[in-house]
């Protein structure tokens, strides 16, 4: 599937817990259905002229032990529209990003230790700088919280120059939590709404813990 997702996003990992995640927002509906791809071996965001198979196949290659730089670069070599793709992500050992020369300006990415940020059709580079600063500000916080703070900072710095409509947070963690898979598909202020839902689900988890310990195993990852 190819859809134009002019957007800003962050992919990150938590060295403390082994979690991976992506947070993203755009001025189109249902961004969470296409851009974020997350699993036990890494996190990938595929955007601009979005090809969802890049995310799906990228995770499969990470599961096979292929480093993320090698996995994503190989997929783009076989992609006739790589000049219009923006893709970035992290695995357990590294991080990698690609912004095609035909992505809508302002566009760009940053590859940092343990995370990547990228965007296209943005108000400017300050969006990514703000996201990076917010993500590293408190490394003791859980990954979902850090990703959401980065998304909020990117929106506050200008975000998508066309406006705003949807947002999503997707996290893989050894400890499954109800606030790890959240989508706002159509809203006037999606990042604010994503924060509201995140807070609600945090409260729901605490209620389960108070009443049932770990919630009767509802959010326990099965041992395979």
Positions of PLM-derived features:
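N-terminal nucleophile
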Residues: 1-224
């Amino acid at each position: 599937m190819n859809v134009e997702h002019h957007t800003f996003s962050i992919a990150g990992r938590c060295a403390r817990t082994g979690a991976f995640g992506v947070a993203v927002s755009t001025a189109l509906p249902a961004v969470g259905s296409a851009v974020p791809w997350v699993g036990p071996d890494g996190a990938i965001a595929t955007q601009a002229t979005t090809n969802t198979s890049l995310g799906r196949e990228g995770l499969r290659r990470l599961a096979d032990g292929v480093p993320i730089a090698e996995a994503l670069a190989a997929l783009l070599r076989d992609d006739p529209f790589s000049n219009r793709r923006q893709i970035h992500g992290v695995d357990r050992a590294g991080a990698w990003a690609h912004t095609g020369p035909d992505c809508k300006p302002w566009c760009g990415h940053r590859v940092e230790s343990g995370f990547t940020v990228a965007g296209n059709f943005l108000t400017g580079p300050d969006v990514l700088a703000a996201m990076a600063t917010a993500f590293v500000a408190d490394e003791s916080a859980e990954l979902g919280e850090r990703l959401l703070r980065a998304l909020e900072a990117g929106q506050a710095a200008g975000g998508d120059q066309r406006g705003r409509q949807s947002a999503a947070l997707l996290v893989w963690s050894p400890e499954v939590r109800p606030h790890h898979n959240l989508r706002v598909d159509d809203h006037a202020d999606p990042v604010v709404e994503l924060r509201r839902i995140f807070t609600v689900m945090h409260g729901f988890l605490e209620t389960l813990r108070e009443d049932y310990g770990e919630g009767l195993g509802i959010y326990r990852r099965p041992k395979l």
